[in-house]
Amino acid sequence: VTTSDRYLAFANSAVGSKLANALGLPRPVPLERMPAYGEPDADASAHAISPPLTVVGGAGDAPLLPTLARELHWLGVPSLAHADRLDWIARANQAGTMSGRFNPAEGVRPKALIFDASAIASTDELTSLYTFFHDTLASLDRCARVLVFGLPPHLAATPQASTAQRALEGFVRSLAKELKRGATAQLLYVAPAARESLHSTLRFFLSPRAAYVSGQVATLQDPVFDTPPMRDQRPLSGQTAVVTGAARGIGEAIATVLARDGAHVVCVDIPSAQEAVSAVATKLGGSPLSCDIAAPDAAAILRAHLAVVAPAGLDILVHNAGITRDKTLARMSEAQWQSVLDINVGAPQRLNAALLEAGTLRERARIVGVASISGIAGNRGQTNYAASKAAVIGMVEAWAPLLAERHMSINAVAPGFIETQMTAAVPFAIREAGRRMNSLGQGGQPVDVAETIAWLAHPASGALTGQVVRVCGQSLLGA
């Protein structure tokens, strides 16, 4: 992955690293990422997880451990047991994976830490978190992963248990800010009905796919559709995806990753970008569609195209197209206000409704919207844009229960500072602040947004709906 971040490159050069250390300057670590469509080894390795040596722990009866043992075996992930959880060795062996005891004195460098905190029923029992991570953090390898599993607080049996489960959020967000060398941490609340639906989430978070996601909280609920048979090599094979705004930047990256994972991608963009979007579609073996999504006949044009390329219906719909018209509110014209709201959130709502009414969206369809940190934290000069992106989040939350009745899911990603042509044109001081004001000390890449969308669009992600996942390196802005 190329980057225009000169400081990142300098700080990791032979001379730059010495100078940064001498002056006490930050040294952001180049993040490990998956190969993209058409890159060397993409077909061989983009679909298979690099097995990260994982240390496993848990509190109480740790009800997720049996499922975790099976999933880690399926993913080919080797594991070690923390001293307080030696029963893990037998569980791993029973699942078909060799395991042993973690001993930090042996100099082992685990790539991941997993802790099942879902049985913690009081704040006193949170001490088990301290013990596990106090013993293991110093041994972590670079670009490591930390996953804490909990029980959704509203499902806890007692007020004391609910209180303790809610504490996990503050713990994980703080821990993510303490991690170094490109490591990340997440909290995954798992409802009892979702315990057998961890596959796509583990596949994502234990791999380089989740390079720029950290400090996030996701909830796996009662799945809205059944998990199909496991197929990690090209999991989207035989499926059709529509990506709007696909001619360049984040949209092109989304189309590229979905194509890498096997989807036929319909690349949609405005007529003036016809040449660019056609080039993207041709490269990916997809199909281009020139269409202004805000036009009154946009849904009809899209349905007509899908009737030809995907007569069985649409599996994945990604609302990526969007615009900015930045002005302070006092200087903003009504046209600048209205165009941003209409394209960024009005058009996606109309497309959703029209495709549902026409029966174009298949059962098990996944819809993903692209929101923004601006929609969460707000941003000066972006009242229109922030309102539209907050509305995307509202759209996801409002549509989730309605789509669940049809066995479909809807989620959103909220990117932070992503290295694109647009951010490259931002003034230097603002650009540098955007890059450094997160726990990973660097901007993200379009592929980071794309990989997160591919996780939410995975056929085995039926337990994820109504979720908003930030792709921001744990930005200091927003909640």
Where are these regions (language model features)?
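Conserved glycine-rich Rossmann-like NAD(P)H-binding loop of the short-chain dehydrogenase/reductase
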Residues: 76-90, 263-278
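Glycine-rich nucleotide cofactor-binding loops and adjacent beta-alpha elements
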Residues: 1-235, 412
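Short, small/polar-rich loop/turn modules that mediate ligand/substrate recognition or access, typified
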Residues: 181-184, 212-215, 364, 404, ...
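Active-site helix of classical SDR
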Residues: 164-168, 352, 388-391, 396
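Short C-terminal tail/terminal secondary-structure segment
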Residues: 214-238, 377, 465-479
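Residue(s) in the substrate-gating loop at a strand-loop-helix junction
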Residues: 372
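Alpha-helical segment proximal to the catalytic Tyr-Lys
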Residues: 177-178, 357, 401-402, 462
